[in-house]
Amino acid sequence: MSDFNILFEDGEALVIDKPTGLSIDTPRKGGPSLEKRLDELRLGFQRQPQPAHRLDTDTSGCLLLARNPKALKRFNMAFEQRIVGKVYLGILAGIPEVKEGRIELSLSKISSAEKGWRMIPARAGKPSVTDWRVIAEVNGRALVEFRPETGRTHQIRVHAASGIGIPLLGDPVYGDGASGPRTMLHALSLEMPRENKAAITATAPMPADFTALGFGPAPLPAEALAAEARADSVIQTGGPSAIDDQD
């Protein structure tokens, strides 16, 4: 019996709502990890499912697992080919003047004895791309929808701090770390097309620490939010805005 919230399940795939604080791999210094709990997720199948991608320890939300080696290979390929649709929600430690945009940065890994390792923008790094937009503002903080096209390590965290100019609330590496209960990032939804099968689709509910800060209880799906924004524009101006025409 598992206490994980199962968001999607079929013969080859499983999507769980990963809780914050749960590492994918067992940390060197020990502690809770998904790796230690994979047996709970067999759910009657012979093999333990294996994660097809990664989420940071603090990040909550949609995590896809494969139930057999062939499925894992196909899922890994789908992520590499960038055909997996991913939407994240993050709370910024401030409100940006610009409300939406596209961030394109090359990222590289550095390390030091004092600060450990981190990702930084660097010309010699690997390209990374994220579309973003503010969807709510509460008490001097912004709830932002992130749509990453690439999947670099710490991509959204670096893009918030260096691309938007405001780090995620609670981020100990790219922000001050003391402003929130954790790095406030949530993998809201995931969609993976499959040949000869229905797509894998899942949406994770808004976590309690997001709603405690005034964001929630659950956001509208991204498509509904976009339609709502267009409708508001028509009401206010008598026609669609220039930004909407570009979408």
Q: What function would you assign to each model-found segment?
A:
Residues 1-13, 19-25, 159-247:
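Pseudouridine synthases involved in rRNA/tRNA modification
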Residues 17-18, 64, 90, 132, ...:
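Residue-level signal for inorganic ion chemistry
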Residues 22-37, 74, 92-142, 202, ...:
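Glycine- and acidic-residue-rich catalytic/RNA-contacting loop of pseudouridine synthases
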Residues 30-34, 79-86:
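A short alpha->loop->secondary-structure connector
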Residues 46-81:
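Glycine/acidic-rich beta-strand-loop module
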Residues 54-57, 136-138, 182:
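A short beta-turn/loop motif at secondary-structure boundaries
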Residues 75, 152-160:
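Short beta-strand segments enriched for Tyr within beta-sheet-rich domains
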Residues 93, 146-149:
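A structural micro-motif recognizing beta-strand termini
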